[in-house]
Amino acid sequence: MTQKIIRVGNIEIANDKPFVLFGGMNVLESRDLAMKVCEEYVRVTEKLGIPYVFKASFDKANRSSVTSYRGPGMEEGLKIFEEIKRTFNVPVITDVHEPYQAEPVAKVCDIIQLPAFLSRQTDLVVAMAKTGVVINIKKAQFLAPQEMKHILAKCEEAGNDQLILCERGSSFGYNNLVVDMLGFGIMKQFEYPVFFDVTHALQMPGGRADSAGGRRAQVTDLAKAGMSQGLAGLFLEAHPDPDNAKCDGPCALRLDKLEPFLVQLKQLDDLVKSFPTVETA
């Protein structure tokens, strides 16, 4: 089965190539913190030889509570992304929530992300696709992996085949998510690169009444399980002080654990991709 290669600058993204890291923090809390977090990701990924794209959100539009922190907004957020790109010479990925945001965000960011909750919103999908920029499509918690073909088709119909699929878990009753490992193989059949968002797969949506809970202690186990499927990349959020993060701290990896965590993931990815394909159909 031929696997599509998506190129972002000098980075090649495909299911049969060494994994790429989309990593950073959940939401931009401040310019200084974003710079600190990116600096550590760059240090570790350069040391380990892992292709890297910085990730953060300028707005968290789907917070549980009306009083929850959402971010600095698009205008200020894009200024921070521009500085990060200049300072660290890394690509940037961020999410958009409304059609009007697609074009200005695409002028700054190398990859734009379609949020899971919004992945069936046709007007948003088409607006993003028409930018021509690479799109990371999050699989909604309520969609089966085979249903992702419809979102791919919307993008392709709008003229964009620079697409990535991203698994982030499926709803399992109330306040819980599970990851169906068989879903990775189903999505890989579409031939586009498939990523695993281990951070949000650890969420317990609404688990703390006014915000999401999480299972940070299990991040290594779940990441290894997902990456054992031979994926194009990993989506990861880290924070220097997760317990005081302004969003999704319970799911975030401690920043000082980033290097030992990625050492193991790279070794696993190298091993899995060294195996020949065994046809069992």
Curated annotation (Swiss-Prot):
Classification via SUPFAM superfamilies: Aldolase
Pfam families documented for this protein: DAHP_synth_1
GO molecular function: 3-deoxy-8-phosphooctulonate synthase activity
GO cellular component: cytoplasm
One annotated GO biological process: keto-3-deoxy-D-manno-octulosonic acid biosynthetic process
Record key words, sorted: Cytoplasm, Lipopolysaccharide biosynthesis, Transferase
Catalysed transformations (reactions): D-arabinose 5-phosphate + phosphoenolpyruvate + H2O = 3-deoxy-alpha-D-manno-2-octulosonate-8-phosphate + phosphate
EC number annotated for this UniProt entry: 2.5.1.55
Compartments, record wording: Cytoplasm
Primary location class: cytoplasm
Pathway: Carbohydrate biosynthesis; 3-deoxy-D-manno-octulosonate biosynthesis; 3-deoxy-D-manno-octulosonate from D-ribulose 5-phosphate: step 2/3; Bacterial outer membrane biogenesis; lipopolysaccharide biosynthesis
InterPro entries: Aldolase_TIM, DAHP1/KDSA, KDO8P_synthase
First-level EC class: transferase
Similarity comment: Belongs to the KdsA family.
Protein name according to UniProt: 2-dehydro-3-deoxyphosphooctonate aldolase 1
Gene (name only): kdsA1
